[in-house]
């Protein structure tokens, strides 16, 4: 009779845990794909994941972590930041991967440099979106990109983003929109 070593037992348990985590993640992603608003958000992450630069990405305002999970297929290192402890806890439980670091500590972002920064549906919820764009722009590597999305109804953001890009020398690389409803669209822009 073959006895199982502690190491073999640990590896079997780890494999079951990882498989369970991945299955949960895929179940959540399937639910997201069925929701019109969240599906539009998913498309923004898919576009950012298709970027040519594939080293480090910051998912600022990562929420529950599903966008970071999508980005982790295309980038060597993903930092998912959100100030909400409950959301970060959920992300760590359901969307953990070796190449993802979820944090709620904004101080950890200081001094780091990223190839891509994603700000999907974040700017309408921050007090000073121009200041946040300026701060995050300094975290970009020289050839980096910032991907931004917001609802078309948030027209004031267009002025803030345009002013920021002109002051900081960022150029609009691409822009698109996707319908959420008869009245609303998600606007997506990439600056480099």
At which residue positions do the language-model features occur?
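Conserved beta-strand signature within the Rossmann-like core of class I S-adenosyl-L-methionine
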Residues: 143-151
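A short glycine-rich, Lys/Arg-flanked "PGG" loop and its adjoining helix->strand segment in the class I
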Residues: 130-142
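Short alpha-helix
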Residues: 155-168
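A conserved beta-strand element that flanks and buttresses the S-adenosyl-L-methionine
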Residues: 118
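Short catalytic micro-motifs in class I SAM-dependent methyltransferases
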Residues: 121-122
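Conserved S-adenosyl-L-methionine
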Residues: 170-180
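Conserved N-terminal segment of class I S-adenosyl-L-methionine
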Residues: 5-76, 80-107
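Core SAM-dependent methyltransferase catalytic element
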Residues: 179-192
